[in-house]
């Protein structure tokens, strides 16, 4: 089964399962949030679903409630960190800069950001 094999080899699935340690800042039955190992801003954490989803490109209708929960968790965690302005980033596919094939959202804050991002 491809899904099972992907999740067994996935570093984010291993973090979600507690097999790899992380600086967890939030966790519930559906998702986990943890500080980025290589922060690009004073505050930089990732929010991921525990379910293995490769990227936004592989979502289906059954994932809509999960995605809403992730967005609400991002809102709460930003407020918990007193972020009035922040950036949420997800990369899709290799050309989009995705390096871990598990859907994840970077939340960056604590400094001013500019556009274009590059």
Indicate residue ranges for each PLM-predicted region.
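HIT superfamily nucleotide-processing domains
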Residues: 4-118
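Glycine-rich phosphate/oxyanion-binding loops and their immediately adjacent helices
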Residues: 1
């Amino acid at each position: 089964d491809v899904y099972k094999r992907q999740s067994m080899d996935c570093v984010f699935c291993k973090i979600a399962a507690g097999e790899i340690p992380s600086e967890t800042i939030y966790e519930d039955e559906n998702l986990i949030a943890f500080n980025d190992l290589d922060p690009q801003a004073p505050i930089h954490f990732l929010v991921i679903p525990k379910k293995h989803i490769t990227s936004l490109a592989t979502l289906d209708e059954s994932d809509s409630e999960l995605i809403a929960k992730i967005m609400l968790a991002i809102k709460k965690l930003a407020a918990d960190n007193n972020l009035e302005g922040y950036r949420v980033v997800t990369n899709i596919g290799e050309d989009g800069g995705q390096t871990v094939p598990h859907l994840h959202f970077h939340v960056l804050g604590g400094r001013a950001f500019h556009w274009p991002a590059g």
